[in-house]
C-alpha cells in the first residue's frame, strides 16, 4: 500500500529590504525645496533670468543626467551666461545644501518601525540606485546608518533596478533566500518588478509614489511604513 505524504512548506519573512528615496526618506520634497532655494539664491547673486526659465533648465538637466548629477549648477551657468561665475555658483550651492539639510527627513513611523522589526529578529537591508556617497550621507544624516544589516548602492552592483543584480547582492549580504525576504519600494517598475524577478515578496509604498501608479503588481500596498510590522506577523503566522 502506497502512502502519500503532503508536506507544506511555509516560507517566513526573515528580512525586509527597503528602497531609500521616497520609501525611507521623503526625497522629492527635499529635492524640490533645495532646488527652489538654490534658484532664488542664484538670482539674488546676479543670475538675471526669470525663475521659471532657470528652474525649467535645472529640471531638464536632471532629466538628462539623472537626479544625482553633481554638476547641475555648473552646466546651468554655462547655458545661461557661457561661463562659471563663482559668486553665483557658490550662492546656489550653499542655499541648496542648507535647504537640503533642513528638509532631509524620514517618513513618519520609519524609525519606530525599524526598531520593532529588529526586535522581532528581522534583518534589514537597503537597495538604492543612488551612488554610495550620496546614499550613505543621507542615511547618516538622518541617523539610520547603523540600523541595517546590509546596504547595496549603484556603486556596489553597477546595475540599476529592476536588474536582478542588486537584489541578489542584498540577499547574499543578508544571508537569506529570496522567498524569505520582502522588498518595500515606491517605484513599481523598478522596486516591485526587480524584486519579484528574483522571487522576493513585495510591498508597494504608496505613500511615496510620485507617479500616481494605478497598477503596481505588488503582494501588498502600504500607506504607512508602520504597516510592515503586521505584514511580517501575518506572513510568519504558523
For each feature predicted by the language model, list its residue ranges.
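Asp-based, Mg2+/Mn2+-dependent phosphohydrolase catalytic module
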Residues: 3-16, 28-29, 79, 111, ...
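N-terminal helical cap/lid subdomain that shapes the substrate entry/recognition surface
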Residues: 11-112, 133
Amino acid at each position: 500500500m502506497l502512502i502519500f505524504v503532503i508536506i507544506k512548506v511555509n516560507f517566513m519573512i526573515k528580512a525586509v529590504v527597503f528602497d531609500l528615496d521616497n520609501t525611507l526618506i521623503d526625497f522629492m520634497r527635499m529635492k524640490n525645496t533645495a532646488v527652489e532655494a538654490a534658484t532664488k539664491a542664484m538670482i539674488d547673486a546676479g543670475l538675471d533670468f526669470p525663475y521659471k526659465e532657470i528652474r525649467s533648465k535645472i529640471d531638464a538637466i536632471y532629466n538628462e543626467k539623472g537626479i544625482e548629477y553633481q554638476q547641475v549648477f555648473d552646466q546651468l551657468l554655462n547655458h545661461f551666461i557661457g561661463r562659471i561665475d563663482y559668486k553665483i555658483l557658490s550662492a546656489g550651492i550653499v542655499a541648496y545644501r542648507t535647504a537640503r539639510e533642513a528638509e532631509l527627513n524620514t517618513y513618519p513611523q520609519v524609525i519606530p518601525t525599524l526598531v520593532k522589526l529588529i526586535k522581532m529578529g528581522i534583518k534589514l537591508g537597503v537597495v538604492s540606485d543612488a551612488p554610495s556617497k550620496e546614499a550613505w550621507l543621507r542615511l547618516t544624516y538622518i541617523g539610520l546608518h547603523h540600523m541595517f544589516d546590509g546596504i547595496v548602492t549603484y556603486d556596489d552592483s553597477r546595475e540599476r533596478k529592476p536588474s536582478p543584480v542588486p537584489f541578489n547582492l542584498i540577499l547574499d549580504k543578508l544571508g537569506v533566500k529570496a522567498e524569505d525576504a520582502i522588498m518595500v519600494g515606491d517605484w513599481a517598475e523598478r522596486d516591485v518588478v526587480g524584486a519579484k524577478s528574483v522571487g522576493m515578496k513585495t510591498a508597494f509604498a504608496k505613500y511615496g509614489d510620485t507617479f500616481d501608479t494605478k497598477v503596481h503588481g505588488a503582494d501588498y500596498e502600504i500607506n504607512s511604513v508602520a504597516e510592515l510590522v503586521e505584514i511580517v506577523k501575518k506572513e510568519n503566522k504558523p
